[in-house]
Amino acid sequence: MLNDLAAFTEAVLSSRMDAEWSYDQKSGRFRDEKGRFLSKEAVEKLVDKRIDKVEASLRRYTRMLIDGAITLDQWQGSVRESLKAAHIQAAIIGHGGRAGMGSAEYGRIGQRLREEYAYLQRFTSDLLGNRLSAPMALARIGLYAQSVRGSYWQGAELRQQQQGYSLMRRILDSQAQHCQDCLRYAAQGIVSLGTLPLPGQRCECGARCRCTVRYFRQQPATVPV
């Protein structure tokens, strides 16, 4: 069973999000594998698709643990490796490719991963203490996959700022239920970049937040003639 787990983990980690896109530095836009420009919505769906795959893999690891097919150490190691790969990949998309990633960017991802690993350690302690039922454990592990979206948004905001965007607007997902915090952020309309927290931050939705952000450049003031 350990060999099966290792093979499955390798397959998950080898599924790279950046195999489906490239970033055009000149236009500041993404292209698909055929060279066609991708919309912002398409890029976000690409991230969501990868997160869904990560969540499925984390749930599978957790079911294997519940069924006694793997040990707690094996489960924790597989979860850590999956989260590490997914957060790095999401950040790379957010920053517009590996060329946009420097030591500072990798440092921010490292800090984020340390926080996630600390949460995971508490999760492990709860499992050891038999404080979680199987449904509770499966629901909780899903939140770790959803947290990957935050690494994308962190990178995207920095990239947009570097490209001269100075305004932002929170956009609600019409298909999702939003908390009062997110409704309040969206109601503020277009504001200065950095005024609003990124999706998943400072809101009751947390990692499940389905908001997006759109960025705008400040239009120069016109003087009437």
Regions found by a protein language model. Name each.
Residues M1-R208, R214-V225:
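Domain-core detector
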